[in-house]
């Protein structure tokens, strides 16, 4: 009914507009039209068909915040004296890290959609020709997920192997909470740990304070290291990736413990060039669509430039003999919708394109290049994978992810869309995707194997047993949230 009313209003608008504009002065028609427009807008705000304009989003956010305790109530109990996620080894086995520990780099590319990898434009031009070739050198996970659509939440999942909070960013909302992190474990094993942003403000989302509190030695924005010439290559949200990579490696060159092989380095590099303002790619750098006219074409230009600059990272790495023993992961912070389901902004919905990202692990001499196609993994699995690969087994940890090398059955994939009334999701057995909208209570269920485009919602006809199993999986999301809020994720022992 609401949809029909909206359609009728849209169809009648031209007639009303002509009638209103025909009047020489403000009259009853203009007042009536204005009142009807306001009333229709109010109906939309109160309906499931929420407008996604800035005013509508603001009003919805205020409304949701005012009833947050009821809307996001966590109906789950846990012994307040326990730390359910902490796992301890049965025996205090000695660590078995390699005598020559490798350097580790995670290149986290902004808004990196999986759909462009090994794909081409309609006229046959590849979006990511360089990355396509690099896939042959490492291990590619074909179905890899970001656990959220926010950069800070993706970084939390990557470094802490936990489900991101769905109420707020852990970096800001729980800034004083202590967790265990991948950087902390590596630091305890002799690594120098770094977090570099291409964005101008390392304090954005409280990144600096939070990561340094949780195991990162050095957290910096690349902007203070830019030359005047470099600053000419800032557009959109920040500096071009090529400049970011070059200045980062120059910074490493000045770190004597790393250059002298006294310490291996772990570094997460978060790019910013491919962030939202895809239409601001300089015209002379638009390789695929010089006269781009829509989001898809602007994104294509931006991601092609991103791919060109990724070559610079590997070229700079190869120039440095002191880094010849390096592991590199290339992935994204989250995906980005390109109108596959009518959405062109990542703060709106929950389809695959919002979460699916590329994942490539390159570790010469440590693994056989290939592909993993029979299982799905997520950012939460990165920390366990790296520790497994280099042979470090912490005596205690709270990681929920699993190593991609582990001989284990498919684990659930947890998804958090914190915007637009909050959508929470879980992918069971690698194929069954269940999503619940907290604001409305609406449920969505898809068989990703038989319906990869997510067109047929099976929730209304799903059997009770399936729903019960999926609802049970949601307990992990709610328990995760409860433990974060109650500071019961991690209890350090003996200073660790």
PLM feature segments, named:
Residues 87-496:
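Solvent-exposed soluble domains appended to multi-pass membrane proteins
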């Amino acid at each position: 009914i609401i949809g029909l009313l909206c359609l009728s209003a849209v169809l009648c608008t031209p007639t009303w507009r002509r009638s209103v504009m025909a009047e020489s002065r403000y009259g009853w028609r203009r007042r009536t039209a204005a009142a009807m427009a306001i009333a229709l807008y109010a109906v939309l705000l109160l309906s499931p068909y929420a407008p996604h304009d800035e005013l509508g989003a603001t009003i919805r956010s205020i409304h949701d915040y005012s009833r947050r305790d009821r809307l996001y109530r966590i109906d789950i109990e846990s012994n307040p004296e326990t730390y359910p996620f902490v796992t301890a080894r049965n025996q205090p086995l000695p660590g078995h890290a390699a005598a020559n520990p490798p350097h580790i780099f995670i290149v986290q590319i902004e808004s990196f959609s999986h759909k462009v990898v090994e794909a081409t434009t309609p006229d046959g031009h590849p979006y990511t020709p360089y990355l396509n070739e690099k896939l042959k050198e490492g291990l590619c996970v074909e179905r890899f997920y970001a656990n959220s659509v926010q950069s800070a939440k993706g970084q939390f999942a990557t470094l802490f192997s936990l489900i991101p909070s769905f109420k707020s960013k852990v970096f800001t909302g729980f800034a004083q909470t202590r967790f265990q992190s991948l950087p902390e474990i590596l630091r305890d094993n002799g690594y120098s740990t770094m977090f570099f942003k291409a964005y101008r403000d390392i304090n954005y989302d409280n990144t600096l304070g939070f990561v340094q509190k949780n195991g990162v030695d050095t957290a910096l924005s690349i902007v203070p290291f830019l030359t005047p010439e470099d600053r000419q290559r800032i557009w959109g949200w920040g500096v071009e990736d090529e400049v970011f990579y070059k200045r980062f490696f120059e910074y490493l060159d000045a770190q004597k413990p790393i250059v002298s092989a006294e310490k291996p380095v772990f570094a997460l590099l978060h790019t910013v060039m491919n962030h939202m303002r895809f239409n601001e790619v300089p015209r002379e750098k638009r390789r695929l669509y010089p006269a781009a006219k829509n989001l898809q074409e602007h994104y294509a230009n931006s991601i092609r430039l991103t791919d060109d600059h990724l070559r610079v990272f590997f070229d700079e790495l190869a120039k440095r003999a002191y880094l010849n023993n390096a592991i590199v992961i290339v992935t994204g912070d989250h995906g980005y919708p390109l109108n596959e389901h009518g959405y062109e902004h990542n703060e709106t919905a929950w389809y695959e394109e919002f979460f699916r990202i590329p994942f490539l692990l390159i570790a010469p001499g440590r693994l056989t290049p290939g592909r993993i196609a029979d299982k799905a993994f997520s950012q939460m699995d990165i920390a366990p994978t790296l520790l497994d690969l280099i042979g470090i087994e912490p005596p205690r940890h709270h990681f929920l992810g699993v190593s991609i090398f582990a001989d284990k059955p498919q684990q659930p994939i947890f998804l958090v869309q914190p915007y637009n009334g909050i959508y929470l999701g879980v992918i069971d057995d690698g194929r069954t995707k269940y999503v619940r909208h907290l604001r409305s209570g609406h449920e969505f269920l898809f068989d990703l194997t038989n319906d990869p485009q997510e067109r047929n919602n099976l929730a209304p006809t799903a059997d009770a047993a399936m729903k019960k199993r999926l609802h049970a999986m949601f307990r992990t999301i709610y328990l995760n949230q409860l433990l974060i809020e109650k500071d019961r994720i991690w209890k350090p022992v003996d200073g660790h």
